Each structure stands twice: as C-alpha cells, then as structure tokens.
C-alpha cells in the first residue's frame, strides 16, 4: 500500500474518532474511542495477534468471515479479532479437504481485540481486503449465535496503570524508545507508525512496538494478555533485544555471504586472466587435456544411431563448459558412465560350454539338490543348442538359507561370465532399478546399468534377490519396471532414466529368487522358468556341514582343522535340537559359536592342542537345546487329538488338531487357533461328513445334537489356512466321537470333499521332511500325490511308512 493511501486512511480514522468523541460528549457518556458492544461478530485470524491502537489491512477469503464483514458494515462496523491456536491449524492442514469446524472454546486464544472497519475493498478473485482500526482488549466469554457467522459475548479488559513511576521504569521506557529507533534504522521502517498514538501513553507504546516486531505468535499473545503496563514494558523490551540479536546474526550471515561472493569473483577474474595468459603463451590447459582424453575414449566405443548422436552432443557441451560450473561435473560423470559401459557385443561362447564341467562346478558348490541341478543343466543345454542366452530368465523359489543366491554365482561360473547380485527386497521406488533423471541433484543410474558398468560385459549373470518382497508406492511400481527389464521384446532397447539411451540387455542371464510366489504378479511370473528348492533333511545338513561349513568356519576363525573335531552325534544334535530351519543359516551360526569359543580356549591354554565336540559337551558351547520333540509327541495322545502336516513359505511343519466336547444348548462346532477362511470351510465340511456317516461309525445322533465340539490348533498367534487339513480334522472328530485314541506316530495330510473323497495337496516334500524331523513313522497322503512321492529322494523317505488313500473310509481304517 502506498504512503499517500495510508495517510488518507489515517485521516479517515482521525475524523471518525473525532466524531465519536463529540457524540460521546454530547450524550454525557465517557467513551475512549467507540461504543463498546458486548456482542460482536468474530473473525478468527490464523497468523499473529493484533494489538489495540493499530491500523492494519486484513484479507478476508472465507464465506463465513465475508458474511460477518457485510453484517457489521451495515451496523456499527465493530468486529472482534481472535487468533487461532497452532494445534487447530495443524489439524486443518492434515485434514484431506482442509476444512474443520472451529471450536471457539478451545481453538482460539481467549484474549483478542475489537476493531472498527474503516474501509472495504472487493478483491478481483473474490474476498475482501478490509482496513481496520483496532480498539480494545477483550476476553472471549461464549458464543451467542453461530448461524451464518459466529457472534460472541466479550468482556472488555482494563489495563493496570503504573502507580509509581520509578527510575527502573524510566530506564525501561527510554530503552524501548532507543531500541525501537535502532530497529527502524536496520529495518528501514516508516516512523509515522509511532505517531499513531501518544508516545507518553506507555501501554499504547508497548502495543505499537510489539506489533512491529517479528516475534513468535506465543510471544505476541503473551504481550496482548498482559494487562499490567509495568509488566508489558518489560516483556516488550525483552522482545526488542531478541529482535536486535536476530538482526545482528542476519547481518553477520549476509556479511559472510558477501565476502564469499567477492572472493569467488576475485578468483574468477584471476582465472580468466590466467586463461588469457596461457592462450597467449600457447600452453594447453588442464580442461582441454581432459576433453581430449574423454573424446578418445568415446571414439573407441561401438556407438550407433541415437546413442552416437546424443553422446556427440554431450561431448560438444563438455568442451564449452567451465570446470568450476556444476553442470561440468554432471556432464563429465555422464560421459564417464558412457565410456564404462559394455557397448560391444560380448556374448557367451557356448561352443566352449562343457556339460561335465558344469556338473562338477554345481556338485562342488552345492551338496545334493539333484532335481534342481538337473533342471539348471537342462536349461543351460537348451541355451547351448540355441547359441544364445536371450530371454534366459530363471526364478528360484524356496525357504531362506537353502542356497538360492549361491546357485546364481555357480551358474555364472558354469557360463564363464561375470556375476552381479542386487536385492529388491523392500524397494518401493522404481528409480532404484531404472535410475533417476539427470535433472535431479545426486542422480544415479539404476541397478541394471550399474551392474553392467561393474561387470563390463553385456552378457553377465544378474541375480535379483527377494523379488517377492517388492512393494509399490507413489514413487512408482517396481514390478512394472521389472516387466520391462525381463521382457525379451522390450529389453533389447532398455532405457534407463539416467542414461536416457537405448541399451541392449537381452543377453543378460537373469536369475531371480523368492521365498514365495504369492506376491509376484502373474504377468511377471509367466516370463520366468520357475524352479522350486525345498529344505534340507538332517542327513543332508550333516553332510553339508562336514564338506563345506566346518572347513569354511574353521578358516574364517583361524582355527586349524586338527585343533577341533566334531563327532557325528554332535552334528545330529545340532540339526535336530538347535537348527530345525529348512536352510543352513542357523546351523552355520551355531558352528561359528562353537569355533569362537574353541579359539578362545586355544589362546588361553596353549598346552591343549585339540578339542572334540560331542553330544555330551555340546550344551557347554551353545547352551540348552532350542527345540525338543513336539510336546504332543512326548505325551500320550488322547481322544480327539490328531497330528497333521502343514506347509509354509519357509518349509514344512507338524500340526496338532485338538477337539473336545461340551454339553451345550447350541450344538455345533467352535473353531479357534487363528484359522483362515479356507480352513474354516474344511472344518465345516469335515463336521458335516462325519455327521453323515455317524450310523456307519455307530455314533449316536445325540453326539451331534447335544454337544458343542470345540476344535483348536495350537500356536494361536500363527495364522493357518489351506484345505490340506481336511482329513486330519475329520479324523479328530471321529476320534472324539468314538472316544478312541489315534495310533501313535501317525500324521496325515489331504483335502476332504463333502462326499468323503481325498484329494491332492501341495508341498509334500517339505511336509515329509517336517514329519521325519519329529519322529513320525506313518504318514497318510492322497493317492493322487503318488507321482510327487516317487520324485522325493529315498533318503528322505527312509524310515517312514506311507499310506496312500482315495477316500476318508480308507483313512478311518488306518486311525486306530
């Protein structure tokens, strides 16, 4: 607002005040400024508090406030201004539509001011710009009416004058005047604002000065609520000192920046002079030397088409940029990436591929896993016949610790090419895979281009780990990027955001790993050859420990192989009672724990040269066993209890089904143990089936009409789902109904139909491994799974009697 306009509105205020005083005198009343209505419309101010005796503009944009302004202009023109609390403003900002109803008792400060609207200007975009003259301090009492706009009742607050004007107060008053003028000189503020009030009026002086200081909302409100003029003088002086400290810090920062700029300008001037001198002398500078090196590297690359043109433009730009500019570094880094990428066609030489050598490498690095190795060798043999690895995408699925990642490294050794691994577990930003655009500060290429730069070949083996743990976010969908990366039709011209050039990655052999297929999108899954890896049985773990883990751990810890021997019984104990996971990570962890303790003993007592780990002294090194036989195997089984077999993403496990009966007026079944919908349906099917054959079982109908059957599966915190517990649940109901105990060491798995047919299930190998680990001797499985049973290695099946069934009636014959 221009100074002439301010002076004009100031004259309007003075005229209005003069008229009001004359009217007050004629009426015999004593009014300092205007009438003092106790009921006034309220306008909530979001920013800082407003003080009395000030002339300020306020922008009105909300419909509620505009209605309040229109209303008071038709009347006495008096409104009240109260400041909103920060808590309400934060809630309003976090609200999705940005609108919240104001609770005037809680959301505004209790002390505000009354003000007279002097002028209203309509804004082009809607809303008003009003100019008000603030009058008195008031305290919010209550809301009287809140229809189109709030009308509140207020109490007028009287300031407490100074009773005794002593030397201290005089010093404070003088300091306020002095510091205010000092701030004016720094801020270059117009001094006419001080002439709005009588300077001798200490209370008004405090209000005017506080209103001009850029302090916090809380500090301003504290001054507004201070009725004692004496206390208000002290608070305002504190604010003035804070303001001057802030000005001093700002000036210091500005001075530092100015000195830095002057130094940079001086350096630039000197560098330009040096550059001119070098040019006159014919001496080539460092930048020119760097440009020539970069150009020679790029000329040696096999660039074509779009890549050749784009890199040429970047090289030309590089020649003109100054070394001190930020863009110089960006362009140089980009060109260095270009020179480090394998633009030449470096395909794997499949003519030199030897199947026997490949088999030896896989056998050397991984024990057992015959089925997996065969699948890998078959897959690579096809690539040899095609003499190309284009479109080679393999997905290894299995529990943690079974060797998925290390198999990827072995495949790279088989193909005699480089290996690069990166994990996408937890990645939510597609830029991690496809790179950031160069416009961003600190931009980098994605993992694919980084891998090619590191391996320096365009036909490496890339292992993308933990693909099932990718998640989408507002930063993009990494799965969609992986579709582009893995699609043979698209990855011929893969375009990284940072590189921004087409790059052929079709010769890359992609291996992906996952613990589960459930979270992987079907379109992505269809592009891959899926190979399932199951967990290890105890015999395999012990053999792997002897051949691979123990030598590795001894070497890592500096212990000689003759200084420590493991008895077979100790390794069996570790496998069965300490490391029951399907992989080998826990097994290796316990071996490391033992070797570290032996290393300490060898250092402490050098007279003992060798130690032996046996079943008897194992607890001394790794503590008490983590696992024992399942509790229900240690105790006698009771009627209604049956052992089932389950499968998870991390391998198989045994599952106990418990049932009990209680007399109830509402017979039926009650299910607990955190069962999923499919398992609940299986329980209902089993209950209905057992009820339908109750006559054949010679079970009295009253069993189903009189009792509530409660079915529970222990470990209630663990979610359980799937149809494969159908025959197990039915067997539990039958055992309970006949009051007979199921034969010991019997486990079962199979889906049950409503008519009593037993249908195929999945995860058979993992379930058998879990059963064997827990000492199960008899397993009932669906006859439809015979093919799966035949594929399972004989060492896993040894010691277990398998009973293949087609119907529930065959299961019943095997129960007791």
From Swiss-Prot:
Signal peptide: none annotated. The keyword Nucleotide-binding applies. Keywords: ATP-binding, Cytoplasm, Hydrolase, Nucleotide-binding, Protease, Serine protease, Stress response. Induction: By heat shock. ATP binds at residues 398-405. It is found in: Cytoplasm. Residues 636-816 form the Lon proteolytic domain. It is an enzyme of class 3 (hydrolase). It catalyses: Hydrolysis of proteins in presence of ATP. Homohexamer. Organized in a ring with a central cavity. Belongs to the peptidase S16 family. This is Lon protease. It comes from Borrelia duttonii (strain Ly).
């Amino acid at each position: 607002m221009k100074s002439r306009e301010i002076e004009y509105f100031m004259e309007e205020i003075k005229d209005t005040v003069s008229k009001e005083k004359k009217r007050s005198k004629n009426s015999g009343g004593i009014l300092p400024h205007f009438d003092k209505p106790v009921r006034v419309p309220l306008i909530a101010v979001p920013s800082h508090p407003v003080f009395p005796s000030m002339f300020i503009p306020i922008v009105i944009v909300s419909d509620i406030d505009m209605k309040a302004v229109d209303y008071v202009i038709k009347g006495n023109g008096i409104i009240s201004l109260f400041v909103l609390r920060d808590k309400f403003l934060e809630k309003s900002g976090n609200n999705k539509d940005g609108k919240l109803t104001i609770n005037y008792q809680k959301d505004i400060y209790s002390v505000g001011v009354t003000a007279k609207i002097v002028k209203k200007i309509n804004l082009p975009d809607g809303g008003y710009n009003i100019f008000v003259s603030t009058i008195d301090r008031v305290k919010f009492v209550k809301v009287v009416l809140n229809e189109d706009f709030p009308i509140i009742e207020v109490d007028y607050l009287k300031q407490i004058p100074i009773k005794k004007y002593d030397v201290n107060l005089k010093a404070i008053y003088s300091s306020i005047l002095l510091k205010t003028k000092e701030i004016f000189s720094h801020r270059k503020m117009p001094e006419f604002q001080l002439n709005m009030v009588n300077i001798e009026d200490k209370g008004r002086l405090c209000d005017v000065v506080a209103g001009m200081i850029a302090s916090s909302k809380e500090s301003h409100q504290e001054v507004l609520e201070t009725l004692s003029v004496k206390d208000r003088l002290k608070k305002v002086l504190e604010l003035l000192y804070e303001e001057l400290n802030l000005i001093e810090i700002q000036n210091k920062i500005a001075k530092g920046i100015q000195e830095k700029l002057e130094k940079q300008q001086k350096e630039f001037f000197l560098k330009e002079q040096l550059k001119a001198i070098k040019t006159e002398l014919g001496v080539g500078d460092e930048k020119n030397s760097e440009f020539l090196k970069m150009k020679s590297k790029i000329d040696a690359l096999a660039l074509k088409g779009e890549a050749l043109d784009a890199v040429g433009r970047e090289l030309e730009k590089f020649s003109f940029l100054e070394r001190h500019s930020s863009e110089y570094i960006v362009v140089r880094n980009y060109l260095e990436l270009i020179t480090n990428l394998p633009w030449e066609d470096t395909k794997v030489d499949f003519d030199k591929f030897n199947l026997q050598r490949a088999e030896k490498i896989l056998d050397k690095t991984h024990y057992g896993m015959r089925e997996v190795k065969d699948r890998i060798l078959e897959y690579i043999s096809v690539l040899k016949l095609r003499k190309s690895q284009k479109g080679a995408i393999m997905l290894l699925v299995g529990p943690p610790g079974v060797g998925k990642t290390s198999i990827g490294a072995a495949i790279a050794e088989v193909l005699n090419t480089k290996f690069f691994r990166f994990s996408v577990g937890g990645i939510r930003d597609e830029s991690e895979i496809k790179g950031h655009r160069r416009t961003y500060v600190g931009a980098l290429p994605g993992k694919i281009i980084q891998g090619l730069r590191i391996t320096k070949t365009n036909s490496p083996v890339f292992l993308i780990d933990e693909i099932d743990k990718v998640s989408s976010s507002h930063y993009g969908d990494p799965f969609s990027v992986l579709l582009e990366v893995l699609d043979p039709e698209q990855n011929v011209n893969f375009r990284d955001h940072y590189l921004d050039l087409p790059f052929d990655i079709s010769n890359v052999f992609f291996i992906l790993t996952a613990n589960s297929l459930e979270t992987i999108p079907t379109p992505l899954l269809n592009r891959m050859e899926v190979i399932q890896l199951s967990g290890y049985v105890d015999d395999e773990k012990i053999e792997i420990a002897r051949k691979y883990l123990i030598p590795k751990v001894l070497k890592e810890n500096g212990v000689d192989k003759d200084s420590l021997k493991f008895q077979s019984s100790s390794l069996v104990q570790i496998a069965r009672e300490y490391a029951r996971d399907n992989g080998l990570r826990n097994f290796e962890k316990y071996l490391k724990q033992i070797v570290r303790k032996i290393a300490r003993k060898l250092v402490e007592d050098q007279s003992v040269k060798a130690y032996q780990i046996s079943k008897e002294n194992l607890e001394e090194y790794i503590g008490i066993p983590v696992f024992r036989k399942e509790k229900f195997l240690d105790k006698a089984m009771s009627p209604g209890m049956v052992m089932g077999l389950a499968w998870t993403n991390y391998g198989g496990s045994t599952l106990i089904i418990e049932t009990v009966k209680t007399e109830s007026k509402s017979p039926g079944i009650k299910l607990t143990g955190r069962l999923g919908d499919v398992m609940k349906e299986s329980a209902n099917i089993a209950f209905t089936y057992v009820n339908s054959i109750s006559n054949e079982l010679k079970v009295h109908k009253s069993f189903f009409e009189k009792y509530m059957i409660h079915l529970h599966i222990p470990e209630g915190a663990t979610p359980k789902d799937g149809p494969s517990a159908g025959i197990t649940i039915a067997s539990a109901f039958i055992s309970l109904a006949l009051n007979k105990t199921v034969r010991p060491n019997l486990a079962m798995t199979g889906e049950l139909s409503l008519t009593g047919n037993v249908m195929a299930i999945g995860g058979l190998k993992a379930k058998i491994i879990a059963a064997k680990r827990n000492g199960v001797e008899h397993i009932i499985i669906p006859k439809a799974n015979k093919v799966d049973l035949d594929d399972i290695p004989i060492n896993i099946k040894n010691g277990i009697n398998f009973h293949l069934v087609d119907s529930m009636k065959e299961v019943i014959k095997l129960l007791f």
